[in-house]
Amino acid sequence: MGQPKYKRVILKISGEALAGNQGFGIDQEVITSIASQIKEVRELGVDVAIVVGGGNIWRGVKGSARGMDRATADYMGMLATVINSLALQDALENQGVDTRVQTAIEMRQIAEPYIRRRAIRHLEKGRVVIFAAGTGNPYFSTDTTAALRAAELEADVILMAKRVDGVYDSDPEINPEAKRLKDLDYLTVLNGGLGVMDSTATSLCMDNHIPIIVFGIKEKGNILKAILGEPIGTYVGRLE
């Protein structure tokens, strides 16, 4: 096995990825597989912090589109990410991986509050840290949370684990002729509406020179491939 290309990573796992083929809730096989892949990466000495989405349980944007107050809908989405984070923590600890959950909204009975220095210390001690409840503010996505935490923790890369295996020129689940894009620069993502991440998150990554790798989570071993720098999915960053 080769040497890891990245020393500290933010792994962004979409809520939809946790649902697997069932489309809603948490697929136990999927979350166990993800946990085993994270364990494999952690054993290489890579610092791993995780941001989990909540779309398998609730999506704030959809709630607000149906007439719900946007802030309320977003807070419900943040709570959905806490559910996912606790499930992932349990899956990791069942495999012997020391894990901490930190929430952007305090709920001390079930998790630590997010404290940057404490999170860094956990990583230095070899623990996996899961960041839940987004940024703690409505109107900000979990993609933006991933970009923000990557900047705060000086991560080398954001690994975006999704249901699809990269970024396409159109929706591959609708268009069978869609083509996967190998390399993109930030401005192309910002201007092209390619659905990598929202503009706030992309701008934050661009301003702080944080590359993004978008890949599919279904195939076991993909997280390790991304860590080792193998060509996988779509790379977003500054192109030479």
UniProtKB/Swiss-Prot annotation:
Its main location: cytoplasm. Pathway: Pyrimidine metabolism; CTP biosynthesis via de novo pathway; UDP from UMP (UMPK route): step 1/1. GO terms for cellular component: cytoplasm. UMP binds at residues 54, 74, 135-142. Allosterically activated by GTP. Inhibited by UTP. Transmembrane segments: none annotated. One of its GO terms (biological process) is 'de novo' CTP biosynthetic process. One of its GO terms (molecular function) is UMP kinase activity. The keyword Plastid does not apply. It comes from the Bacteria. It is found in: Cytoplasm. Keywords: Allosteric enzyme, ATP-binding, Cytoplasm, Kinase, Nucleotide-binding, Pyrimidine biosynthesis, Transferase. Residues 20-25 are annotated as: Involved in allosteric activation by GTP. It catalyses: UMP + ATP = UDP + ADP. Gene3D superfamilies: Acetylglutamate kinase-like. It holds the Pfam family AA_kinase. InterPro entries: AceGlu_kinase-like_sf (IPR036393), Asp/Glu/Uridylate_kinase (IPR001048), Uridylate_kinase (IPR011817), Uridylate_kinase_bac (IPR015963). Its EC number is 2.7.4.22. ATP binds at residues 12-15, 55, 59, 168, 171. Belongs to the UMP kinase family. Catalyzes the reversible phosphorylation of UMP to UDP. Homohexamer. NCBIfam families: pyrH_bact (TIGR02075). This is Uridylate kinase. The lineage of its organism: Bacteria, Bacillati, Bacillota, Clostridia, Moorellales.
